Design a protein with these regions (language model features):
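Long, compositionally biased, intrinsically disordered regions
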Residues: 10-232
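Glycine-centered recognition micro-motifs in short, flexible terminal segments and loops
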Residues: 1-12
Length: 232
């Protein structure tokens, strides 16, 4: 079983990334604030949705539903670099891994986060609040140390004692995924130019990580990346 924070890369006459990068969630910070009793509390739901999706995307090479993939156990793992010729470098299949992961994360979580929002609206209405809600627009940005989630949905909440209105829900979730995806991209680049001979250079570069390679039958290779400090 893969450990938290670990990235595994498979090469089956190709390079397949199974980035089992479990989000290192420390906190979620909503930027909205209502009077006591009138809050839209769905940050926990958003956290769960993002975490679940990151785990799934990680195990499928960064794709929610990959079309060009390798079946590994119960996962369909997308090829990120591929060749069907021995002794020839593989050809990169995904130009910008972090951006692709970001887009797939947005696509995979959009409807679920909308559902989180609607569930919170229903809860407020059940408590007697008058709520005007809207279809939300989701933006997700991966940055160093964070997953930034912006859910825009013009909403107003009112009761006999007053009301509030707002446009955006802004969440910031601590995560190592951006850095791990960047390192995975470096491994892909190394395979293209140097094969697995570049692993020693990468070990020196990322000295705080434990980088291992395991060769499989049929030309397969498994790379693993583990944080030396946290052992995740």
């Amino acid at each position: 079983m893969l450990k938290k924070g670990q990235v595994t890369i498979f090469i089956i006459l190709a390079i397949i990334i199974v980035a089992a990068i479990l989000v290192y969630f420390l906190w979620v910070r909503p930027t909205y604030n209502f009077q006591e009793g009138g809050q839209l509390n769905f940050e926990g739901c958003v956290e769960d949705v993002i975490k679940e999706s990151v785990e799934k995307l990680g195990m499928q090479g960064g794709f929610a539903n990959p079309e060009f993939y390798y079946d590994y156990k119960t996962n369909s793992v997308a090829y990120l670099c591929y060749t069907n010729l021995y002794y020839r470098p593989c050809i990169r299949q995904v130009a910008f891994l972090s951006q692709k992961f970001e887009a797939e994360l947005k696509k995979d979580t959009g409807a679920k986060i909308q559902s989180c929002y609607e569930s919170s609206v229903r809860e407020l209405r059940s408590k007697g609040f008058d709520v005007k809600d809207a279809e939300g627009n989701l933006e997700i940005d991966l940055s160093l140390g964070k997953i930034n989630v912006l859910f825009s949905a013009p909403t107003s909440v009112s009761s006999d004692s007053g009301g509030s209105s707002f446009e955006d829900f802004d969440f910031s979730i601590n995560s190592k995924i951006y850095r791990l995806l960047s390192i995975a991209s470096s491994i892909v680049e190394s395979e293209i130019h140097s094969g697995d001979g570049g692993i020693e250079i990468l070990r020196l570069t990322y000295y705080d990580l434990n980088l291992e390679i395991e060769r499989q039958e049929g030309g397969s290779k498994i790379y693993s990346i583990e944080d030396e400090t946290t052992k995740e």
